[in-house]
């Protein structure tokens, strides 16, 4: 896996060095993982993406009902980590969202 080092955190977004990826995170995720600029999150990347996808998925479902496929497609637009999206959608389905 390519090294994931945080360039900056602006509002609720993580920007990475040498990468086009931007992850939307909640303040809870920022606190939970003690994220700050300069951190190497390579080892925590999958877990952070999963948590962020789960929270974003729950938020999207609070706005309107979506099919499992529709929710997955929407999250795929926001997150590069496809495994995290699949896990998050499956958990939301198990929880009855």
List each model region and its residues.
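An alpha-helical, amphipathic repeat domain used for nucleic-acid recognition
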Residues: 1-97
């Amino acid at each position: 896996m390519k090294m994931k080092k945080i360039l900056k955190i602006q509002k609720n977004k993580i920007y990475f060095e040498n990468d086009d990826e931007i992850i939307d995170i909640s303040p809870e995720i920022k606190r939970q993982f003690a994220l700050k600029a300069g951190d190497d999150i390579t080892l925590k990347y999958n877990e952070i993406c999963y948590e962020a996808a789960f929270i974003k998925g729950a938020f999207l479902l609070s706005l309107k009902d979506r099919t499992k496929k529709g929710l997955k497609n929407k999250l795929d637009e926001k997150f590069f980590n496809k495994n995290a999206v699949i896990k998050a959608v499956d958990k939301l389905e198990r929880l009855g969202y």
